[in-house]
Amino acid sequence: MTFSQILTHPGSSHKDEFLACCLLLAENPVAIVRREPTLEDLADVSIAVVDVGHEHAPERGNFDHHQFPKDHPPTCSLSLVLQHLGIYEDARAFCDWLEPAEWFDTRGPVDTASWLGVERETLFKLNSPIDTTLLRRFAKVAKLESGEPLWEVMRWIGEDLLNYVKTLRTRLNYIGDVGEFWRISSPDGGFTVLYMPREEPLADDSSAGLARFIDSHPTMTAVAGMVYPDRRGSGFGLSRHNDNPRLDFTRIAECEDVHFAHARGFVAKTSASDPERLKELLAQAWV
């Protein structure tokens, strides 16, 4: 389904309809109009009606959640658009911010803070001026069209989010095919790291998806670190997983084949590429 226009409500703007519009814009580079919909708009399959209209009918391009009963699972307009695009489950798995956003939009800050186990004030301490400015500017316009700065930024956001969700699934499958779990011996019984061999062509971020893959793996509690190709050289990067303090890469900082070790010990870069040498460095870094 393609749309000739995206329509959302006027007045104050919230993250859910803003991001929902961004996603729709990524696949439908059309004008965004902010006004109340008419019955004709709701019936027109060429118009995406977002977060307004009291109707969830994806077959007609209508994505509102306000008509759902109060005990409905937290579901916002962003949830509905992600479902329409067929990527909701992956987005819930890969975007840690999505479920809190659903809660905040449908339950408000008090219930969301309680669900997260934090004080209400903590939520607002995490607010970003980027969010505030984009939402405030979006709330001020009646129509956005191609070429306008905010329209272009919204399309970028939508494209990046779509690309992240779609390519991460492919990346995780690839890691599962070629990655290896290494068991590194130590006096106290040893530890496990995830190793990614060098690939050609090398990914833009060779460590992308590694932590997410580990966290979805049954052995995640045993994995202390990651080894992955270094884009800046022929060697490898070594890093902690979940900031495991027992890997301290300052312990290998003086090794001839280690050209960088962060002062806080959580990451290092080495020119070594032989698996046995990499294992030696990891064992030496273990506290």
Task: Describe the predicted segments one by one.
Residues T106-P201:
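Hydrophobic, aromatic-enriched interface-forming segments
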